[in-house]
């Protein structure tokens, strides 16, 4: 059984696998990767980092949907 950690996604505590990547979190939350920015513990992540960055206990993740319009 995979070890679980607690992370905070947009302020809400979530139990997730300790092996989960930021990219997997984006998919789990059904967000469109091209239309979202991710901040981890106060640092903005580049999209190419998402597959390499594994969540850790206590991480604070902010998923910000980008909206454009006039």
Where are these regions (language model features)?
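Ubiquitin-like/PB1-type beta-grasp interaction modules and other compact soluble beta-rich domains
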Residues: 1-69
């Amino acid at each position: 059984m995979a070890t679980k950690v607690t992370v905070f996604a947009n302020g809400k505590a979530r139990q997730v696998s300790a092996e989960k990547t930021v990219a997997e979190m984006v998919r789990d939350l059904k967000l469109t990767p091209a239309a979202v920015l991710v901040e981890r513990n106060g640092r903005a992540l580049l999209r190419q980092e998402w597959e390499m960055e594994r969540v850790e206990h206590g991480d604070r993740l902010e998923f910000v949907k980008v909206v454009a319009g006039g």
